[in-house]
Structure formats: structure tokens, C-alpha cells
Amino acid sequence: AFDGTGTFTGNLGTATTTVADSVTMTAAYNVLNGKTVNHDGSESAQALVVTIASADAAADLSNITSDITNLTANFSETQTFIGNLDSKTASVANDITVTATAADVTGDTIAAAGNGNIAVTALHSTLAADLSGLSSSTGAVTAAFDGTGTFTGNLGTATTTVADSVTM
């Protein structure tokens, strides 16, 4: 059982891990991948924070089994994310840039702290992308449209660039 708020860096083995009431467990994706982390029998303010470092840029949060409703991700290093947030809310640390295709972040909620940045690529390949859940405190949210197409999605607050000789 995880009984006190903190960061776990060890090996969870094959056992199901439980998180006590009002406790936040933070661990790297490579520690939690393929594991089961649940609340202790009652859902009472537990939280599970999955840290995604650049080495885990292909992280697929659907590989973590959990009945904790407050399961979030935190991008801790600059990276090109090619994974799956599995509809979980994510944050980007201050001064970090996360780059991802529109297909990988459409419909997701990702908030960058301080000067954190979110750079969306291949917007032309996901013409109905919903970027309305992407935000940055004082950094930037950008989107690149590099092929001709009719965009029908939601750009949110993203500053969008359209490549030369391309129509959006």
C-alpha cells in the first residue's frame, strides 16, 4: 500500500498497489507501465500522477490499470510525444516543450505551466482535430498546417501556421 504522498521509484512487481485516502502517488511511466494501481477500497481524494520523460515519449496510459479517477500525466522533459494519454488530463512542466501530432492530442486536455509549450504538428492530417483543451500559462500553443485541406475542427487558442503553397 502507498500510504503517504510521494514519488515512487522502485519496482512494483506483479502485485496490485493500493493508494490510501488523500494520498498522491507519483511515478514514472516506465514504473507504472503494465501495472495495476487502485484506491484502497474507497475513492477519497487519492491521486496517481504519471511522469512522462522523453525516454517514454511513446507512453500509452491505457497500459496502466487503475480505478483512481484522479489519474493525470505530467510531461517532465522536452519531447516529441507519440503515445496515448487515454483521455487523461496532462500537464507540461515549466520551460518544457511537448511536440505531438494533432491525431495524438485531439480532444485531450493538456496545460503547460509557466513558459511550457505545446507544439502540434500534422494538423492537415487530422482535419477535425479538437485542440480546445490545449493551453499554456505564458508559453505558446502552436499548430502547423502543412497540406491543403478543409479544417473543420477547433483550434482553441493555438497560433496556427499554414505552410507556403498550402490552402487551409
Protein language model features and the residues they cover:
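Solvent-exposed, low-complexity segments and loops of surface/extracellular structural proteins
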Residues: 1-168
